[in-house]
Amino acid sequence: MLCRAYGKINLSLDINGVREDGYHTLESIFLPIDFYDLVDIEKADEMSFSSNKYYIRYNESNTIRKAIELMKNEFNIKDNFKIDLKKYIPTQAGLAGGSADGSATIKALNHLYDLNLSKDKIQELCMKIGSDVLFTYYHKPALVSGIGEKIEFIDVKKDYYVLLIKPKYGVSTKECYSLMNLDTCVHPDIHKLKEVLENGEDFISYLGNSMEDAAISLVPEIADAKKDLLDSGAPFALMSGSGSTVFTMSEDEELIKNIYKKLENKNYFLRYAKVLKNKRNW
């Protein structure tokens, strides 16, 4: 079973608290994009894992492995699997590639074994793997809050095109959180942003990312990427998630393509994408 594992951008991210268990709480507009990994899972006599990227290991931190082991335990699945991951979304990028791989695995096994998982069970399983996994299961525009378990789908009025620009180095989410100061970081108005997106109005004045300053202290090249985007004519430049990817977005597809051309000879990972507005399961 071949599944697409769609990435996302955070069109503003507000880290607004820390729970007693140490988890940070957030409010954010998550937008899925048509940039994805491919997860192929088949029943097999023995467990095997392969990937087109040499650095991807089938270890305890691998979200596909987490999902496989979780599903086997939850539903008494005895089979082994042949797993192949075509990895295109960069790691430590703030694009939820690993989370999407985990949710794609849950989808695949849900289909292979006709489990007919309820929404509550899907939420339970996804949250056991990671905070962005539930959103990537549905990959539909949403206001996400709590620690990722609260999802309110939104109707984005216009079509948008995105340019992703990632420096060479990634950001450790754990390290980034440890450097944050919730009293001094930016706290964008996520609910106002939701409102203007649903009305098709200008959203740029409502953008912000609470984690950006901390991430730049770890990877200063993020600031360079933002400057290069703006110098190339981007309407704005914002970091996604905990970084290190920076992006811009516009309803003007030609503008995004022209910015891509201006930056394609620089030492960045570049990707043009479109925001997904409708639910896609596979």
Outline where the language-model segments fall.
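DPxDG-like acidic metal-binding loop motif
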Residues: 93-124, 135
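Conserved, helical-rich catalytic subdomain that frames metal- and/or nucleotide-binding sites
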Residues: 49, 138, 143-236, 251-264, ...
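Short, well-structured alpha-helical segments that form the helix of a local strand-helix-strand
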Residues: 118-129, 257-261
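Glycine-rich beta-strand-to-loop/alpha-helix junction loops that act as flexible
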Residues: 97-98, 239-244
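Short hydrophobic/aromatic beta-strand micro-patches
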Residues: 247-249
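ATP-binding N-lobe of GHMP and related small-molecule kinases
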Residues: 1-93, 111, 115-120, 156, ...
